Amino acid sequence: MINKDTQLCMSLSGRPSNFGTTFHNYLYDKLGLNFIYKAFTTQDIEHAIKGVRALGIRGCAVSMPFKETCMPFLDEIHPSAQAIESVNTIVNDNGFLRAYNTDYIAIVKLIEKYHLNKNAKVIVHGSGGMAKAVVAAFKNSGFEKLKIYARNVKTGQYLAALYGYAYINSLENQQADILVNVTSIGMKGGKEEMDLAFPKAFIDNASVAFDVVAMPVETPFIRYAQARGKQTISGAAVIVLQAVEQFELYTHQRPSDELIAEAAAFARTKF
């Protein structure tokens, strides 16, 4: 029951998603925590952040287009956010606002969890959205043989130069052990919902398929790779792990793997 001691966590986004709201509130309820999570939209990020501070809002998830523009209004930037100059999580400790990027944290942890070979050749397809978090995570995890393939030449070249990698505008004569999709290809409801993020022959010659598209849980890219016995890491794993990292920052509690899976399954029905 909501009362005077209930701690509020929130999200600020141009287009709020139900996933985070449902996921966090499910865990609060199951763990008996006096928290509530609510999504908000805003056009004024400066005053929204001032509101977070002034009203004692415990935590705030930040989505596009505010991940970079919110940074001047925060007190401390964690290395996870410094690594990509982008924030997706704010923690309010008695008026002191600390900023993190749990997307970056999640990808680093998934690289470690799946024991990805640092000597492997990697191709990242895409240069927008999650691309910076993905590329920085691979860079700071010790991967040197990474190339960025993007349809947008300008942003692809910029991202490659930013982290000291090569940009390629074609997959012809290329080969990689780890394939990472950071485009919207395969996304539910998108124009390319049924498409593969990489050519079939390319996937056949790879060892790992990594997709950041969260819905559906299994994109065509992931399904094709699984059918051929490849190691796969789904966007669903990314979105859940980054949300868990947020939850722990807000509450100082880490739910069990079973409860996390339960909350994620429930949240997907509301996505």
Swiss-Prot record:
NADP(+) binds at G126, S127, G128, G129, M130, K154, S184. GO terms for biological process: chorismate biosynthetic process; shikimate metabolic process. GO terms for cellular component: cytosol. Optimum pH is 8.8. Changing K67 to A/H/N: Loss of activity. It comes from the Bacteria. The active site is at K67 (proton donor/acceptor). It catalyses: shikimate + NADP(+) = 3-dehydroshikimate + NADPH + H(+). Its EC number is 1.1.1.25. GO terms for molecular function: NADP binding; shikimate 3-dehydrogenase (NADP+) activity. Keywords: NADP, Oxidoreductase. Pfam families: Shikimate_dh_N. Substrate binds at D103. Homodimer. Belongs to the shikimate dehydrogenase-like family. NCBIfam families: PRK12550.1. In vitro, is able to catalyze the NADP(+)-dependent oxidation of shikimate to 3-dehydroshikimate. However, has much lower activity than classical shikimate dehydrogenases AroE, indicating that shikimate may not be the biological substrate. Cannot utilize NAD(+) instead of NADP(+). Is not able to catalyze the oxidation of quinate. This is Shikimate dehydrogenase-like protein HI_0607. It comes from Haemophilus influenzae (strain ATCC 51907 / DSM 11121 / KW20 / Rd).
